[in-house]
Amino acid sequence: MLSFAACATNTHHVDAQSYAPIGPALARVAIVPFYAHRLYEGSRRLGGVPPELATQRVTQQVTEAILAEGIEIVPVDEFARAFEDVPRATAVIDAQIYAEGAGNHLGATSVLVGEVLRYRDARGATTPGRHPASVVFQVTLYEAPDGFKLWSARYDYTQPPPPEKSGSDLHDAALMQHWLTAHEIAQRGAEAIADLLADAR
């Protein structure tokens, strides 16, 4: 039984929670292809992206960000081959299956399981500030092969609109504001989460 006291941090729009020391678990991480949360917000009418595309993008961004921190991972194609016949249920249920399998057969010391809750691009070519891009995703690190929950983080960012102005001032503010895409926001989140993991080694 793990007895490490939970510890929370909040930085770069990331809320992170530690449940046990995670340093040794980062020796070789298996990254599970992200899930779309059951409450996924991705309506195309609202600037959203289909869940299968959103999860693919975030999985790739998080994987690349973790690799950039010098953390060894189980190659994505190797992981996919090992579990291609395992039906996916939910992130929480499958975490135990992946932790045991990746630990016993792929040499993983942990598995990172993620869910995308929102992946929405800005709407409106001239006034995107009314409907800005917004991304929310969360990850959980489990020890392998035992499946103990070690660490979790949630990234949540919606680009704020420029200050309220009127007339020509509003036009100038819109020109000065760089309207982020969902992809750019997700990239920032992936890098922030990878940075927190690297700091915990």
Short names for language-model regions:
Residues 26, 46, 50-58, 91-94, ...:
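Extracytoplasmic/periplasmic, Sec-exported soluble proteins
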Residues 1-5:
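Sec-dependent bacterial lipoprotein signal peptides
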Residues 23-27, 103-110, 141-151:
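A short, structured loop/turn motif at beta-sheet edges
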Residues 125-130:
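Outer-membrane beta-barrel translocator domains and adjoining extracellular loop/strand segments
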Residues 73-122:
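Short, solvent-exposed, polar/charged sequence segments at loop or secondary-structure edges
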Residues 7-84, 186, 190-201:
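A structural "domain/chain start" motif
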Residues 110, 133-135:
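Hydrophobic core residues within well-ordered beta-strands of beta-rich domains
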